[in-house]
Amino acid sequence: MTWHEVNDVIVITLPEIFDMNANLGYLTREKNECMYEIENNIITKVIAIGEIRSLVQVSVINNKQMIVQFLNDSRPVEQWKREEIVKYIHEWFDLDNDLTPFYEMAKADPLLKMPARKFYGLRVIGIPDLFEALCWGVLGQQINLAFAYSLKKQFVEAFGDSIEWNGKKYWVFPPYERIARLTPTDLADIKMTVKKSEYIIGIARLMASGELSREKLMKMNFKDAEKNLIKIRGIGPWTANYVLMRCLRFPTAFPIDDVGLIHSIKILRNMNRKPTKDEILEISVPWKEWQSYATFYLWRVLY
């Protein structure tokens, strides 16, 4: 991580392959997003690291430097806490990943060459917090994206914390410790199924007990991490791979049964039917070690 501070503002040096407009195109796709606000190409968000609650504005200069400005007197005094915030931002935008091999592969790939050219500099936007990533995966199961965002907003505003600034509330995702103490009845006002409520509370309790953690999963290889996630009630292969991709940063994560992925392939290949799983496996052979990026770019084609 290369960064420094100027007058209490954090300045992060960006990798060569980075385009803020491409990333904002992804981040602004849903008006119901409750975890950040974007105005004039500036992201305002609360970054929570343990008990740290920092309200920051993130902007970019010439795709070379990322500027992180603290609002509302929320700049941590201790340098190690500011380092954790920089680390969070690196994970959020996947800044430590050299995308050169991905683009070398994509420019020769019949399916990826168009999205790789059109969305050059797009990163797989992450969800660094494991509980948030798992909840988002569960909330999105078998419903459309707009309704999933609505459920997330209800959940966050019912059980999360917030920082108020300039008359607006900026939200922190509910901590697993808080959700672990609830019952499905407590979530009844949120228009999710009882099953989803049970799944989310169950995940929170596994994390509260220490049985499940990001640190433990990160020490595993891909297959073991996938198996450990799938054995959790409410987590199937799709959700597991979504979390492996967006939180744990396994490059081979591949939600092969994803509806959006299937639809994107159908569009780009001008098919009059859905591609089969075997066809997708064959198409994806050149994507080895970059399946997560290939998936993310194919999703991006859809909006």
Swiss-Prot record:
Expression triggers: Up-regulated by methylated AdaA in response to the exposure to alkylating agents.
Superkingdom assignment: Bacteria
GO molecular function, one term: DNA-7-methylguanine glycosylase activity
A Pfam family annotated for this UniProt entry: HhH-GPD
Protein name: DNA-3-methyladenine glycosylase
A Gene Ontology biological process term: DNA alkylation repair
Enzyme Commission number(s) of this protein: 3.2.2.21
Site (Determinant for substrate specificity and/or activity): 238
Annotated knockout phenotype: Disruption of this gene sensitizes cells to the alkylating agent N-propyl-N'-nitro-N-nitrosoguanidine.
Function of the protein: Is involved in the adaptive response to alkylation damage in DNA caused by alkylating agents. Catalyzes the hydrolysis of the deoxyribose N-glycosidic bond to excise 3-methyladenine and 7-methylguanine from the damaged DNA polymer formed by alkylation lesions.
Annotated gene: alkA
Gene Ontology cellular-component terms listed: cytoplasm; protein-DNA complex
SUPFAM superfamilies linked: DNA-glycosylase, TATA-box binding protein-like
Additional remark text: Overproduction of this gene renders cells highly resistant to the alkylating agent N-propyl-N'-nitro-N-nitrosoguanidine.
Catalysed reactions, as listed in the record: Hydrolysis of alkylated DNA, releasing 3-methyladenine, 3-methylguanine, 7-methylguanine and 7-methyladenine
Active site: 258
Keywords, comma-separated and alphabetical: DNA damage, DNA repair, Hydrolase
Protein family per UniProt: Belongs to the alkylbase DNA glycosidase AlkA family.
Enzyme class: hydrolase
